[in-house]
Amino acid sequence: MDLQFDICQRCHLQGTAILHQGKSFTDFKPGEHLEEIMDVYLPRFENDNSFIMASHVDRLKQSECFNNSDMTCVSCHNPHKSVQLVEKNYFDKKCMDCHNVCRDEENVSDCFVCHMPKTSSIDIPHVSISDHKIAIPNKISKVTKEKIFIGLVSINNNSPTNISRAMAYLKRYESFEKNPIYLDSAYYYLNQSPKSLAFPSFLQYYYLKKDYYSLI
């Protein structure tokens, strides 16, 4: 099941990808574990539920349906048939394979409107995507809470190395957002890594920090 899941998340899990030493983006082949090739990181925030376009895997992994069953992507999706070609109630039938009770009498035949609502992504404007975090809808809070950064999390590998974590923070800083927290976190993980592996990333760290004296 894990190997099958890795095929899907090679494309449907995008974020800050850190290749393992000696690996390239074309090295992954079906039947291999994606974590043997790369670690894919996404930021976690407290009081924030937004997500990027290609985060189907990340969102699904946060679902109770996924965590409490043997559910995979192909439990609902036929990889050889476009969702545009399936019958209208195809996905609702998939839900009803496990769930046969709906308390909302007005939407007894449209599970996805409530539990996988369409919303926008934070990285691509003017598109809508079904949120793959299958959940019971909560009442919308009128109180706006501060979004607090928790850290970068490897979605496909529960035990990434410290050098992988450090490289993820450096890449995040360089490619997405010049947040000093990323550099601080990178420095912490670099100091937890073997010096022989960390040396190139230390050079990148000092360059991004504009500490050119330390590069000499």
Region locations from a protein language model:
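Primarily the internal scaffold of c-type cytochrome electron-transfer domains
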Residues: 1-184
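Amphipathic alpha-helical repeat scaffolds of TPR domains
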Residues: 156-174, 193-210, 216
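Alpha-helical linker/edge segments of TPR/alpha-solenoid repeat scaffolds
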Residues: 140-145, 209-215
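The canonical alpha-helical register within tetratricopeptide repeats
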Residues: 185-188, 192
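Tetratricopeptide repeat
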Residues: 186, 215-216
